[in-house]
Amino acid sequence: MKTEVTENIFEQAWDGFKGTNWRDKASVTRFVQENYKPYDGDESFLAGPTERTLKVKKIIEDTKNHYEEVGFPFDTDRVTSIDKIPAGYIDANDKELELIYGMQNSELFRLNFMPRGGLRVAEKILTEHGLSVDPGLHDVLSQTMTSVNDGIFRAYTSAIRKARHAHTVTGLPDAYSRGRIIGVYARLALYGADYLMKEKAKEWDAITEINDDNIRLKEEINMQYQALQEVVNFGALYGLDVSRPAMNVKEAIQWVNIAYMAVCRVINGAATSLGRVPIVLDIFAERDLARGTFTEQEIQEFVDDFILKLRTMKFARAAAYDELYSGDPTFITTSMAGMGNDGRHRVTKMDYRFLNTLDTIGNAPEPNLTVLWDSKLPYSFKRYSMSMSHKHSSIQYEGVETMAKDGYGEMSCISCCVSPLDPENEEGRHNLQYFGARVNVLKAMLTGLNGGYDDVHKDYKVFDIEPVRDEILDYDTVMENFDKSLNWLTDTYVDAMNIIHYMTDKYNYEAVQMAFLPTKVRANMGFGICGFANTVDSLSAIKYAKVKTLRDENGYIYDYEVEGDFPRYGEDDDRADDIAKLVMKMYHEKLASHKLYKNAEATVSLLTITSNVAYSKQTGNSPVHKGVFLNEDGTVNKSKLEFFSPGANPSNKAKGGWLQNLRSLAKLEFKDANDGISLTTQVSPRALGKTRDEQVDNLVQILDGYFTPGALINGTEFAGQHVNLNVMDLKDVYDKIMRGEDVIVRISGYCVNTKYLTPEQKQELTERVFHEVLSNDDEEVMHTSNI
């Protein structure tokens, strides 16, 4: 039953909350600043799982296992909707079993039909699973709906099409939804939909000047308003009135889940992240604990139920998508801890409760648990986080100080994998992201050396450029050629991105996510790089060794020979690391020189997900690695293929220990890659110390060093931004991975159960460096005086 949302309702909901600057204008950021309580204690207060929780968990796991054997159910006769699809339950015969309601579909693990990104893609997914869309629905959609994919390919230039065909610019969100937008879903809990709708209406009325930008903005606000009404309707399916604010922590969690699941019902973006939720929920929890409304056991049970709901989220995906994002990730990235501008840390009890779910309901890839790390966080929390990483290898860490230098504020969160966002940033920066996947910079360089002819398919001309004809490659000549190749690559990439995001806003605008954001926002446009380490190492080999080109009778370069030694990126050698910084600077500056859609800000990520494997299979030989080549019959030969390293990782051929890797990455300028610099690391427990306590303590010290400016490299301000931390021995997990058993590991930017990886991806994972020593320097020290 809907409640009339009066002033009395707000007084009741906000009773005991401090401050006024968040009451008259929606701002979870200001609310948190006035009300959160830093927690300096340890994990001893935590509660374990209840029998009810374990029963719900078993139903979810059994249902998923069943569908993995027989196939998941798909909607084939209805288009997805926030409020037109009936309520779903974990067990339809025992609805009271659940504490937190709201599911993606009317049945557990039934997959929604989402054609607005591309009808052909949505129907192909069904075909790949032996199904087909209802003929009547197909006729209606094909005759009346323009999809994002339709719009994009109407506008794509010939240069973009050539680059896509060559797989130099590929994997872009032109055949799947873009994702990476994070609504501030706690707004629904704090204010209720009625408040948010009235605020949107006022902002719509305030726009009086009619021009192109304002016409579009007025329409978008209207769509956001309608989406909020659909969220109210969605809640009503479960007998919940989310038009009003939440009254306690259980309702706060419930309201957040309704907001988030409303998004998941209609938006299948490449990343659907949760944002900075724990700290807000903690404020409600602390009030309820003080009042005696709920016990610690009850609050943990609410959190467990919420996390179990998040783990039910699943999208229908095409096989081509799975090659780029294997393991079926949903990137429900949940950010916690961090520092406030006033010098107080932002660790709360709720952060512990979220991490505790790895024990209470078991280790799992989702949600993507992310700790915003600073050396000034309480040691008890840092140690607890490291002990959970040591046990589970399913938490990632992001450096607060590094990100703050580029304007990411105290309520910043992580989108998808490693990309920081600041959704309520009042200076109009970093509010959301226009996602752009990544392009193959190494392939562009190799193609440029061959005069614009593809590095695998030598008869295919991708772009116009003079070839490098030298037998022995000269560094300055190669860099001049590479600079021109980067001009072509970035020009083409920007054109594709501007088209993609224009058409996404036009044909599949994410109104429900945008409804939980400030009305006036500015986006980051996230450009990415693949093949980074091999590009840097190739340039280093050309500069510091002797690189000879091997050519066919037409002068086409098909391979390279290297004589002499050269430094590699990842060895803490400034000669190579300076080249890495130069490549990043060149790439970012070229992108930033362009006019971007809606005045977005150009950002760059060194992140690959599992696409490093896919891109490796599309790239020929370089001076530092073996790629693919064509057989006489024109098929691609992968027999000698060496996979790209993921993200910002150094090549597996780089010498040195973990600390040398960390130093090389810390030298990269975050301003040139402020969409994320992803390091995925595997370190043996034996490398960290003899006892578990010693290993955990050393992990704390190493992360403090990596994320504190100057701590790893004395006399500098260098610091890292991201670490995917796996604490494991390869020999302990190799057989399990290859047999397809459950092994949870962190890969480039997310967490995956390795049983869902392809054989090639499993091979690449096990070929990565598993550090058995911290350093190849016996005199190694971290400058802990700087921490």
Swiss-Prot record:
<feature type="active site" description="S-acetylcysteine intermediate">
    <location>
        <position position="416"/>
    </location>
</feature>
<feature type="modified residue" description="Glycine radical">
    <location>
        <position position="749"/>
    </location>
</feature>
<feature type="domain" description="Glycine radical">
    <location>
        <begin position="645"/>
        <end position="774"/>
    </location>
</feature>
<protein>
    <recommendedName>
        <fullName>Formate acetyltransferase</fullName>
        <ecNumber>2.3.1.54</ecNumber>
    </recommendedName>
</protein>
<keyword id="KW-0119">Carbohydrate metabolism</keyword>
<dbReference type="Pfam" id="PF01228">
    <property type="entry name" value="Gly_radical"/>
</dbReference>
<keyword id="KW-0963">Cytoplasm</keyword>
<dbReference type="Pfam" id="PF02901">
    <property type="entry name" value="PFL-like"/>
</dbReference>
<keyword id="KW-0012">Acyltransferase</keyword>
<comment type="similarity">
    <text>Belongs to the glycyl radical enzyme (GRE) family. PFL subfamily.</text>
</comment>
<dbReference type="InterPro" id="IPR004184">
    <property type="entry name" value="PFL_dom"/>
</dbReference>
<keyword id="KW-0313">Glucose metabolism</keyword>
<dbReference type="InterPro" id="IPR001150">
    <property type="entry name" value="Gly_radical"/>
</dbReference>
<dbReference type="GO" id="GO:0008861">
    <property type="term" value="F:formate C-acetyltransferase activity"/>
</dbReference>
<comment type="pathway">
    <text>Fermentation; pyruvate fermentation; formate from pyruvate: step 1/1.</text>
</comment>
<dbReference type="InterPro" id="IPR005949">
    <property type="entry name" value="Form_AcTrfase"/>
</dbReference>
<dbReference type="InterPro" id="IPR050244">
    <property type="entry name" value="Auton_GlycylRad_Cofactor"/>
</dbReference>
<dbReference type="GO" id="GO:0005829">
    <property type="term" value="C:cytosol"/>
</dbReference>
<dbReference type="InterPro" id="IPR019777">
    <property type="entry name" value="Form_AcTrfase_GR_CS"/>
</dbReference>
<keyword id="KW-0808">Transferase</keyword>
<dbReference type="GO" id="GO:0006006">
    <property type="term" value="P:glucose metabolic process"/>
</dbReference>
<feature type="active site" description="Cysteine radical intermediate">
    <location>
        <position position="417"/>
    </location>
</feature>
<comment type="subunit">
    <text>Homodimer.</text>
</comment>
<keyword id="KW-0556">Organic radical</keyword>
<feature type="domain" description="PFL">
    <location>
        <begin position="8"/>
        <end position="629"/>
    </location>
</feature>
